[in-house]
Amino acid sequence: MSTFAIPRSVEWHETHVTILNQQKLPSVTEYLDLHTLEDVHDAIVTLKVRGAPAIGITAAYGLALAASRYETESVDEFQRRLKQDRDYLASARPTAVNLFWALDRLVAAAKSAASVNEAKTTLVHEAIRIQIEDEDVCRRIGEHALSLFHRGDRIMTICNAGSIATARYGTALAPFYLAKEKGIELSVYALETRPVLQGARLTAWELMQAGVDVTLITDNMAAQTIKAKNINAIIVGADRIAQNGDTANKIGTFGLALLAQSFGIPFYVAAPLSTIDLATKTGADIPIEERHPDEVTHLNGVRIAPEGVNVYNPAFDVTPNELITAIITEKGIVYGDYETELPSLVAKEEHHETA
């Protein structure tokens, strides 16, 4: 079994949360200490921390940190302020369902507390539990995903659904780390992922840290690369999965799914059950965040487009369920019939947790 480095993105301390500043990668490896609720909110908005699970973990720690400083003995007042701060953090990224899931889980956990001190302790323990669980979930996703690949396969991915987007291992990148552990050779082709370049800055960086074979391409090279390099499969992460399997992920994912269909290769989505939002019936109900035009018109602070040009900058797109070969979760692989199978899988997990 190989030993190698898998970078981590979030760490809890009693007085602050430490994150890997993903905006500075790959040129600078910088860790930031977040001391306030506003620090955490800003880190999420500005993509210093990104990736749905990592956002959820960071927000959970941020809420626990803020609550630890409430100066009240009233449980009712504590709960009121907790919900207010929950809503503030939830506004940071409207598409990432793990953000709401983690925050709501903390709020629910604190409800059973008989005192303010008990509630504060409960929040910290619950946030830590979310991170520990996510690492285990990601490893199990990786095991299931790895079962779909064969030694020597060439696999394409977009954005960064890796270790630094989660507690550890990642979702779409998890099988590559586990393959490395087991001595199974796989090759990864990573799209640069304009306009913020998560594929170039983050995916290529973290896979290289672990010694995984990775080749970087620009987004508009995907079709030619699939053809010329005989790509065997495409695997992506997810920011939100609707009840029917429609999947919101980084902009460009939908186009990759269409290419997979055209070339007759499988298109896999890897995500934890917490990313499945049963309250969202179809992809049409998923809000798509639009980001600042400067992300498109500027590169490293330098303008690369004419001043005043109109810009459309959606951060995500939605891949229809019929283009998805399978959704890989910690509880197994779902092939089609998502509208029935996904709620069933989530219900089984909820029953297991309450049993």
UniProtKB/Swiss-Prot annotation:
Gene Ontology terms: biological process: L-methionine salvage from methylthioadenosine
Annotated catalysed reactions: 5-(methylsulfanyl)-alpha-D-ribose 1-phosphate = 5-(methylsulfanyl)-D-ribulose 1-phosphate
Pathways involved: Amino-acid biosynthesis; L-methionine biosynthesis via salvage pathway; L-methionine from S-methyl-5-thio-alpha-D-ribose 1-phosphate: step 1/6
InterPro entries: IF-2B-related (IPR000649), IF-M1Pi (IPR005251), IF_2B-like_C (IPR042529), Initiation_fac_2B_a/b/d (IPR011559), M1Pi_N (IPR027363), NagB/RpiA_transferase-like (IPR037171)
Domain of life of the source: Bacteria
UniProtKB keywords: Amino-acid biosynthesis, Isomerase, Methionine biosynthesis
Claim: Amino-acid biosynthesis is one of the keywords in the record: yes
GO terms for MF: S-methyl-5-thioribose-1-phosphate isomerase activity
Subunit text: Homodimer.
Reported function: Catalyzes the interconversion of methylthioribose-1-phosphate (MTR-1-P) into methylthioribulose-1-phosphate (MTRu-1-P).
Protein name from the UniProt record: Methylthioribose-1-phosphate isomerase
Gene: mtnA
